[in-house]
């Protein structure tokens, strides 16, 4: 018996890509943005097909992402930001609501929303995940977006 497998690829399908970026912790977030753009361009997306939309912070990213998804102009949306744990429960609220909100937008509009919002315990962890020891999570989110666009196109064609 031969099993059929359907998988996405990283070859950029035609389309536009939106980066919704939270400005808080910009010293980390800008590395995520650079990583995402680099990954998209290396996989065939033209810079003219990439739009960066800046939100104040991670908590605001889901609403901005929803408005972008409503427009129907983008093949995928890549959410980028950084929430760093402090001494209050603020971290849990912001990280949780951002995560839930982005998942809701993706399901509601059928548009891939790649999650590149760091939720970390320390500045050191944020730096590691934005281009040093642990790779660049912005680039990883961009690759996830490309793969999802490809996968959904295959599923819709069947």
UniProtKB/Swiss-Prot annotation:
Family matches, as Gene3D superfamilies: Lumazine/riboflavin synthase
Gene Ontology CC, one term: cytosol
Keywords, in A-Z order: Riboflavin biosynthesis, Transferase
Entry annotation: catalytic residues: 90
Protein function: Catalyzes the formation of 6,7-dimethyl-8-ribityllumazine by condensation of 5-amino-6-(D-ribitylamino)uracil with 3,4-dihydroxy-2-butanone 4-phosphate. This is the penultimate step in the biosynthesis of riboflavin.
Organism from which the protein derives: Ectopseudomonas mendocina (strain ymp)
Binding-site list for 5-amino-6-(D-ribitylamino)uracil: 24, 58-60, 82-84, 115
Record-listed (2S)-2-hydroxy-3-oxobutyl phosphate binding positions: 87-88, 129
Catalytic activity, as annotated: (2S)-2-hydroxy-3-oxobutyl phosphate + 5-amino-6-(D-ribitylamino)uracil = 6,7-dimethyl-8-(1-D-ribityl)lumazine + phosphate + 2 H2O + H(+)
Pathway entry: Cofactor biosynthesis; riboflavin biosynthesis; riboflavin from 2-hydroxy-3-oxobutyl phosphate and 5-amino-6-(D-ribitylamino)uracil: step 1/2
GO biological process: riboflavin biosynthetic process
GO MF annotations in UniProt: 6,7-dimethyl-8-ribityllumazine synthase activity
Enzyme class: transferase
UniProt lineage: Bacteria, Pseudomonadati, Pseudomonadota, Gammaproteobacteria, Pseudomonadales
EC number: 2.5.1.78
Gene: ribH
Protein name from the UniProt record: 6,7-dimethyl-8-ribityllumazine synthase
Membership in a protein family: Belongs to the DMRL synthase family.
Keyword Transferase found: yes
Assembly with partners or alone: Forms an icosahedral capsid composed of 60 subunits, arranged as a dodecamer of pentamers.
């Amino acid at each position: 018996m031969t099993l059929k497998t359907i998988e996405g690829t990283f070859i950029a399908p035609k389309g536009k890509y939106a980066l919704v970026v939270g400005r808080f912790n910009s010293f980390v977030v800008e590395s995520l943005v650079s990583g995402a753009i680099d990954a998209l361009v290396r996989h065939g997306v033209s810079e003219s097909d990439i739009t960066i939309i800046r939100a104040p912070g991670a908590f605001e990213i889901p609403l901005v992402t929803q408005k972008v998804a409503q427009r129907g102009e983008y093949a995928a949306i890549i959410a980028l930001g950084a929430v760093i744990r402090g001494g209050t429960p603020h971290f849990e609220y912001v990280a949780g609501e951002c995560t839930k909100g982005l998942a809701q937008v993706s399901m509601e509009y059928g548009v891939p929303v790649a999650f590149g919002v760091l939720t970390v315990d320390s500045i050191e962890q944020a730096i590691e995940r934005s281009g040093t020891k642990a790779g660049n999570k912005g680039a990883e989110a961009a690759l996830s977006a490309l793969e999802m666009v490809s996968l959904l196109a295959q599923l819709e064609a069947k």
